[in-house]
């Protein structure tokens, strides 16, 4: 039985002390929950999970604040994002994917530590997620081009457009958290009919 050194995969704990409200990161002053990996990197015989960091332990008041902020931003389809030109929304999505790639190494390591995936599978999940974002951008360009013309069916002319659906709650599953959250987020905010 060969033990692999975990030194190359070690990460410094990330302590998140902010949450998103009204498009801005707001400082969290309340309680936090620590996030641990089940992987023990200590050499002693006693089990000791590895601290990965901490996250805000949001209470109902802050959760409602975030929800109301999201509803206000959508504004029943009249908010900035849903009324933004398609090309501008696509630029935002591309900028997000580009910035996401800048953090590939740390996200891959977090997937390894937090859910116990090996490096190859973690890299595949990250790369597949980023590729999905870029593919969604390309497909939406095609959809937008084809929807720019009127269609006729049974003597009725129609102009069908796609747009963001609105506010969604997205919980990531344990096995593919990055993929599932990205798929749900993109479909709800960009490409649904």
Language model features with spans:
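A short local loop/turn or secondary-structure capping micro-motif enriched for an aromatic residue
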Residues: 35-37, 60-63, 152, 178
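Conserved small/polar residues in nucleotide/adenosyl-binding loops
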Residues: 184-193
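Terminal low-complexity tails and localization/encapsulation signals of metabolic enzymes
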Residues: 1-55, 91-95, 127, 142-172
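Conserved coil-to-alpha-helix start sites within the AMP-binding
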Residues: 173-183
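Glycine-rich loop-to-alpha-helix module at the N-terminal edge of alpha/beta enzyme cores
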Residues: 41-144
